[in-house]
Amino acid sequence: MYIQHAVAVQKYAQQSADNMCAVTLMTVLSIRQPWLNIGEQMKDVRTNKLQAKALWGFKKDTYIYLESNKHKMYAQVMAVINSNKTDASKAMSLMKIFLRVDGLGMAKAGFMCQLTAGLVGCMDSHNIKMYNLDAKDFVLAKNPKTIKGLDANVKKIRNYIQICHEYGTEN
């Protein structure tokens, strides 16, 4: 069942900037929310835009970012997906694109890679607990100011991708 839905979402997300924006918004709305509420929240945002009740806190900033950058993000993602890069290189490139989105941390950026390209996956708090992993390993420096800080973030992203691959969260 998962593979059927994942591939359908990937095809949908790859069709247009608006579709990819909708999938990204769905991903952000799912943060700290029961999955069953997401459909209603998506409807709320489609109807009420910035005044939607579902857009609280950082989610409003994410919506603004997506509306302003969806075409650029879509072009970048599709360029990576359609490239001749290895899956590992595609995963890293996609993670870097999605980590630029306001409100997406490592887990949700990985989820977006999964929902758009079948790569990486979502090691959220539930999976971290289930697999007995250390959550600190998945937290990036917000604004690394040094080469050492940047290198540490790249290392954490690579480690995250590898863990997702090892635990089989990709298609």
Locations of regions flagged by a protein language model:
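Short acidic alpha-helix initiation/capping motifs at coil-to-helix transition points
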Residues: 17-21, 87-90, 152-155
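Short, charged/polar micro-motifs that form catalytic or ligand-binding hotspots
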Residues: 11-15, 19, 28-31, 53, ...
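Short amphipathic alpha-helical segments and their helix-coil junctions
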Residues: 1-16, 43-50, 90-95, 160
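Alpha-helical ds-nucleic-acid-binding substructure associated with the helix-hairpin-helix region
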Residues: 33-102
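Catalytic DNA-binding helix-loop module of base-excision-repair DNA glycosylases/AP lyases
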Residues: 88-140
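Short, hydrophobic/amphipathic alpha-helical patches that form generic packing surfaces
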Residues: 22-34, 63-68, 114, 170-171
